[in-house]
């Protein structure tokens, strides 16, 4: 896949993920500020991650938490600021939807403060009065994983 003069590759190979690079980005994000490295590593271990690469360098990341049948939750999606507006996030979302372990999932969920237009293009709709969510605000006060 080429975007201009850059070759973008999306890989499901978790061994290629640069955990330090991804953690540095995610720990500074609005959605995961304060997440410890141990918590991040565990979240990657317990999910279906993928990486986006440009000429071998990681430039994006996303992961899905799922039971592989009923539900999948898309999390920690990011693209390096220097590589945005190249369609990388869209390619990552497509790759997650086509992940061989997630093909039977019926409900896909996510939370975002700023990327609703992208996700709407991939079939996501704003939640209606049928969906509910519980937020445990005390979770952040529990002892973190190290």
Where are these regions (language model features)?
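Acidic/histidine-enriched, beta-strand-rich ligand/metal-binding domains
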Residues: 75, 82-84, 102, 118
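Conserved acetyl-CoA pyrophosphate-binding loop and the N-cap/start of the following alpha-helix
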Residues: 83-92
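A conserved beta-strand-loop-helix scaffold within acyl/acetyltransferase catalytic domains
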Residues: 38-78
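Acidic/histidine-enriched, glycine/proline-rich intrinsically disordered or flexible terminal extensions
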Residues: 138-146
């Amino acid at each position: 896949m080429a975007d201009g003069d850059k070759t973008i590759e999306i890989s499901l190979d978790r061994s290629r993920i640069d955990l330090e690079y991804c953690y540095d980005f995610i720990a500074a994000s609005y959605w995961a500020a304060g997440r410890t490295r141990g918590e991040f590593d565990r979240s990657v271990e317990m999910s279906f991650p993928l990486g986006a690469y440009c000429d071998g360098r990681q430039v994006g990341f996303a992961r899905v938490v799922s039971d592989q049948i009923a539900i999948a939750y898309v999390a920690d999606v990011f693209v390096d600021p220097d590589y945005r507006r190249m369609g990388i996030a869209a390619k990552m979302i497509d790759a997650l939807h086509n992940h061989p372990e997630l093909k039977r999932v019926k409900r896909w969920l996510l939370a975002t403060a700023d990327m609703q237009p992208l996700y709407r293009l991939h079939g996501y709709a704003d939640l209606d009065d049928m969906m509910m969510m519980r937020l445990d605000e005390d979770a952040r006060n529990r002892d973190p994983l190290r």
